């Protein structure tokens, strides 16, 4: 049975525990970031090959105060993933939809994909999620901690929240 994420943004305090748990589970080091001139506490500023999840900050000026809204952003693991179409046009099997969990998985073979095909994948994704590591060619994003989910556990970001 396919799984999905439900994030109650009214309860999110932007602690970034989900973001850190994901990085630790994936074995990623911290990103070098700087806040100067950025004007936000969002850190890092966007998803990247070493950040599959980022807590987005949205500041709103209300009548008499400023309000912050937070949204943990990551792959939505679409039921019909549009990012899969350009990959399949290029070569079948690069992007798979795990039937047991519903996770959209980018295989290691994606690293050989030309940059223009990757750009089409990014353009097709309505959430602007996939990222390519320019050094290694690896295309990556949240994998829903598929190995944990298959063992009956929750993804690390969910566990941390």
Residue ranges and their predicted role:
Residues 1-160:
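Non-ligating segments of multi-cofactor redox enzymes
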